[in-house]
A protein has these predicted regions:
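P-loop NTPase catalytic cores that bind/hydrolyze ATP
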Residues: 58
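Charged interaction scaffolds used for protein-protein
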Residues: 1-3, 26, 30-49, 61-160
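Broad gene-expression machinery/nucleic-acid interaction feature
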Residues: 1, 11-13
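Glycine-centered positions within short beta-strands or beta-hairpins
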Residues: 6-10
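N-terminal pre-domain segments used for targeting or regulation
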Residues: 21-22
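A broadly used, surface-exposed interaction patch
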Residues: 15-18
Length: 160
């Protein structure tokens, strides 16, 4: 069992088992067993809303006991809470599978995390580059040159 805190400072326990997998299937029409194929993990990492929906379904019994609706849960999920919750879900999902599949899923998850870190580093490097600054400045100059070139006459402006 993995835990995370939402932005309302509530602690949630994520437990992936047959019951929670069936609940996610029933409520969201998402089969967590498809994690083995890899596409589901990519979707869970790439779409911050999807893991929140899945986690709510996984934690639904706890949410119902606390009187927390799907909407209230969603309002308490943003930023780091989503990342922590997604990590808890993915780790629990990996641990659900038997040893052979679990090893493959751990490798796939590690690859995706490495790829994500590399992507962030490349984007950060690009944003810090003087070349980007020069390109943006050149585009701004083009806009400045073209904006003063054609002025509408006051006759073409409708009077209210």
């Amino acid at each position: 069992m993995k835990t995370f805190k939402d932005n309302a400072d509530r602690t949630w326990t994520v437990t992936v088992n047959v019951d929670s997998i069936k609940r996610v299937r029933s409520l969201l029409n998402i089969d967590l067993m498809e994690a083995v194929e890899g596409k589901l993990i990519e979707r869970l990492i790439g779409d911050p809303i999807l893991p929140c929906d899945v986690i709510y379904c996984v934690c639904k019994q706890d949410a119902d006991a606390k009187g927390i609706t799907d909407e209230e849960f969603g309002r308490s999920m943003a930023g780091d809470a989503i990342e922590l919750a997604t990590t808890a879900l993915l780790e629990e999902l990996v641990d659900f599978f038997p040893q052979g599949k679990r090893q493959l899923l751990r490798k796939a998850l590690a690859k995706l995390e490495t790829l994500q870190e590399m992507m962030l580093a490349v984007v950060s490097e690009r944003l810090d580059s003087p070349e980007l600054d020069a390109e943006l400045l050149a585009e701004l100059r083009k806009l400045g040159d073209s904006s003063g070139a054609s002025r509408a006459s006051s006759d073409s402006i409708p009077v209210p």
